[in-house]
Amino acid sequence: MSGRGKGGKVKGKSKSRSSRAGLQFPVGRIHRLLRKGNYAERVGAGAPVYLAAVMEYLAAEVLELAGNAARDNKKTRIVPRHLQLAIRNDEELNKLLSGVTIAQGGVLPNIQAVLLPKKTEKK
């Protein structure tokens, strides 16, 4: 007996951590950036996976709302204006990105109620 155990395990094709977690965002790159960014002395194995999942979810949410805004304006391409409309019309995203200025985003159309013409009753 040479002590090799039962059947040698052959390593198959390597699988990225992103694909293991079912994500599109790069877990390995986020892990590297967390280590290099002096955020903490050590970074756990689950932290970059969690962060990648959160970032992917937020990106998908913003893109879906911006796509809806583009479709409402009969456009096929998302431009900064559509991002602005999507974010500012969503209460939670607006709160999250309240301190963010989107270049070429414009403003939300809004007319104060006191500036609107008075409605007169006709008898």
Swiss-Prot record:
Tree of life domain: Eukaryota
Major place of residence: nucleus
| Positions with biased composition (Basic residues) | 1-18
Cross-link Glycyl lysine isopeptide (Lys-Gly) (interchain with G-Cter in ubiquitin) residue location(s): K119
Sorted alphabetically, the Gene Ontology cellular component annotations on this record are: nucleosome; nucleus
Modification N5-methylglutamine occurs at: Q104
- Keyword Cell membrane part of the UniProt annotation: no
Q: Which Pfam families match?
A: Histone, Histone_H2A_C
This entry's Gene Ontology molecular function terms read: DNA binding; protein heterodimerization activity; structural constituent of chromatin
Where is the protein found, in the record's own terms?
Answer: Nucleus; Chromosome
Q: What quaternary arrangement does the UniProt entry report?
A: The nucleosome is a histone octamer containing two molecules each of H2A, H2B, H3 and H4 assembled in one H3-H4 heterotetramer and two H2A-H2B heterodimers. The octamer wraps approximately 147 bp of DNA.
Family annotation (PANTHER family): HISTONE H2A
Q: What does this protein do?
A: Core component of nucleosome. Nucleosomes wrap and compact DNA into chromatin, limiting DNA accessibility to the cellular machineries which require DNA as a template. Histones thereby play a central role in transcription regulation, DNA repair, DNA replication and chromosomal stability. DNA accessibility is regulated via a complex set of post-translational modifications of histones, also called histone code, and nucleosome remodeling.
Q: Which family does it belong to?
A: Belongs to the histone H2A family.
Spell out the protein name for this chain.
Answer: Histone H2A
State the organism's lineage.
Eukaryota, Metazoa, Ecdysozoa, Arthropoda, Crustacea
